[in-house]
Swiss-Prot record:
SUPFAM superfamilies xrefs: P-loop containing nucleoside triphosphate hydrolases
Name by which UniProt lists this protein: tRNA dimethylallyltransferase
UniProt: substrate binding residues: T11, G12, S13, G14, K15, T16
Annotated source species: Acholeplasma laidlawii (strain PG-8A)
EC supergroup of this enzyme: transferase
Name of the gene: miaA
InterPro entries to which the protein is assigned, alphabetical: Dimethylallyltransferase, IPT, P-loop_NTPase
Pfam families: IPPT
Length: 280
């Protein structure tokens, strides 16, 4: 199995800076695992890495698609898998859990073709005849429709590898941080973003439907729905809630090795562990 290093954690935990130092030391390349930084024009508000911050390390899927271009988790999955095959030492860095897991594990996305469904009993009969070994909740119509769609496409559902089976040999680093400290860091970072032109960036994108933390609240401010202090408070509250969900998701779904993001020995600890993992 191809070895892949993955660095995840909440927004503001220091993933970007750590990943660049590690990649530079190991001759690795970084694949962006943040679903917002994939888009062009979303620069300041996404805390997108700059060319200077890359420090010569090759990055992929940064400003990859236009803001009005459809780009799904399936597109991300296919792009990342292609890159993993091409890169000698691939790192994936970001906090978008489903995106990261879909690329590294055997997620299979159902085709969204128009399918005419018979009644439930007829679908169950077709499923049972075509795939006697299937395990499915027959009291769940959506599950039945999904299995039926798969059967008529010519593929047995029971032969599908479960989505919790990894396709690669993964070393997963989760950067953890005390929530009070994280909140302070986020507040400082938000002030810096505004100094850099976050409000102006959002104003230039005002006609886009941006349901993204930060852009959404600044857009409301620009539309006169609240003042700037209220917008900032809402951004921090939403970001902290998101960080809590991120931690729960990664710990439960991907079982990472948890590191203290504020440890003075963090770089040395990660470097040592990754070297052991990749065998250098």
């Amino acid at each position: 199995m191809k070895k892949v290093v993955c660095i995840v954690g909440p927004t503001g935990s220091g993933k970007t800076a750590l990943s660049v130092k590690l990649a530079k030391s190991l001759g690795a390349e970084i694949i962006n695992g943040d679903s917002v930084s994939i888009y062009k024009k979303l620069d300041i508000g996404s805390a997108k890495i700059t060319t200077d911050e890359m420090d010569g390390v090759k990055h992929h899927l940064i400003s990859h698609v236009a803001l009005d271009e459809p780009y799904t988790v399936y597109n991300f999955q296919q792009d990342v898998r292609t890159l993993i095959d091409q890169i000698d030492k691939p790192f994936i860095v970001g906090g978008s859990g489903l995106y990261v897991k879909s690329a590294l594990y055997n997620y299979e996305f159902e085709q969204q073709d128009n399918v005419e469904f018979p009644n439930i009993n007829e679908m169950i009969e077709v499923i049972r005849k075509a795939d006697p070994d299937i395990e499915i909740d027959l009291n769940n119509p959506r599950r039945i429709e999904s299995a039926y769609r798969t059967i008529i496409s010519g593929q047995k559902r029971s032969n599908k590898t479960k989505k919790n089976e990894p396709l690669y040999d993964i070393y997963l680093i989760y950067l953890d941080m005390d929530r009070k400290i994280l909140k302070k860091r986020l507040e400082t970072r938000l002030d810096l973003m505004i100094e850099k032109g976050f409000i102006e960036e959002t104003k230039a994108l005002i006609n886009y439907d941006l349901n993204i933390i930060g852009y959404r609240e600044i857009k409301d401010y620009l539309n006169g729905m609240n003042d700037l202090d209220t917008a900032k408070e809402k951004i921090i509250t939403a970001t902290m809630r998101f960080a809590k969900r991120q931690k729960t998701w990664f710990i439960n779904q991907m079982k990472p090795k948890v590191y203290n993001a504020l440890s003075p020995d963090l770089l040395d600890e990660c470097l040592k562990d990754i070297k052991e993992f990749i065998g250098v």
